[in-house]
Regions:
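Carboxylate/His-rich catalytic cores and anion/metal-binding grooves
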Residues: 150-151
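Cell wall/extracellular polymer interaction/catalysis modules
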Residues: 1-9, 13, 17, 21, ...
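Basic/polar, cationic surfaces and motifs that engage anionic cell-wall
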Residues: 3-6, 75-110, 115-117, 121, ...
Length: 286
């Protein structure tokens, strides 16, 4: 059965920070700036052309043709060029049955998505994937009615079968500001995997692939490489960073990289290098 109340994980912040976006009940976070380091990869350079042949003939040309044939010319293939990752299939809010009457205010938007933070919901792992919509509906109710937020905190959900679900309203291809990583909501998108990955749960291959796919696509919309680093200015004291600190993070990071929490759980956090690598490969194969 679906989680009856989808309680928020104890390691997640229980309230939206005092510097939350205008869509949240509290005042906006201080102005945040981000500088990406390094920038999105540009196209690989093509192989340099060989140096030109000498224009002057040698002073003593050979009297006969050389006995050994000249080496045959072989074409070399240019390295693959990066491309924008394809948009994965995303289950819309309408399709998973979001109660839009719970959402009173319109979404707010970022200038750019510089990073993706990966989370877990810390709920049960013993669910059928057909129950995923009901679980997300329960989380929506909890985030609005208990946490006092305007909408879901996360921008996307992924279940163990690898299905991606739209989270906070505002447009999956838009830089919608969420409420998921205190101090860094002003730069990022949040992706949460249904289940608990701190207390024995292990992310499935399908879930890891889906997290990589949605992260690569979301970052790609903003010209951000999924295996890069980015420097973000902390907008609050997070237990890991102080207000104003310059935090250099992976563009696909775990919640614990920005905030003092166990989220996204030990096993999911340890899978992030693989997820980053998979996301990076997608920009050459999509």
């Amino acid at each position: 059965a679906a989680e009856p109340s989808a309680p928020a994980p104890s390691q997640e912040p229980t309230a939206e920070p005092s510097t939350a976006p205008t869509t949240e009940p509290t005042t906006p976070a201080p102005s945040e700036t981000a500088t990406q380091d390094p920038p999105q990869p540009t196209a690989e350079p093509s192989a340099p052309a060989p140096s030109q042949e000498p224009t002057a003939e040698p002073s003593t040309a050979p009297t006969t043709e050389p006995t050994t044939p000249a080496p045959s010319e072989t074409a070399t293939q240019d390295p693959p060029q990066p491309t924008a990752p394809a948009e994965p299939t995303i289950v819309s809010r309408a399709d998973w049955g979001a109660d839009e009457s719970l959402v009173a205010d319109p979404p707010s938007y970022l200038d750019k998505v510089d990073a993706v933070f990966v989370h877990h919901t810390a709920g049960t792992n013993n669910y059928d994937c057909a129950e995923s919509p009901a679980i997300i509906r329960a989380i929506l109710t909890y985030h609005v009615k208990t946490n006092g937020w305007n909408d879901l905190g996360y921008n996307f959900f992924v279940d163990k079968c690898g299905t991606v679900f739209e989270g906070r309203a505002g447009g999956v291809d838009k830089p919608v500001r969420g409420a998921h990583t205190y101090g860094f909501n002003g730069y990022s998108s949040g992706v949460s995997l249904l289940g608990d990955y701190e207390n024995g749960g292990t992310p499935t291959a399908a879930a890891k692939q889906a997290i990589a796919d949605i992260s690569a696509w979301k970052l790609g919309l903003h010209g951000v490489a999924p295996e890069a680093k980015v420097t973000l200015t902390a907008a609050g004291d997070t237990g890991v960073w102080n207000t104003g600190d310059k935090a250099t993070l992976n563009t696909i990071s775990g919640h614990r990289d920005g905030y003092a929490t166990l989220c996204p759980g030990a096993t999911l956090y340890s899978a992030l290098p693989e997820i980053r690598s998979t996301a990076g490969a997608s920009i050459y194969t999509s």
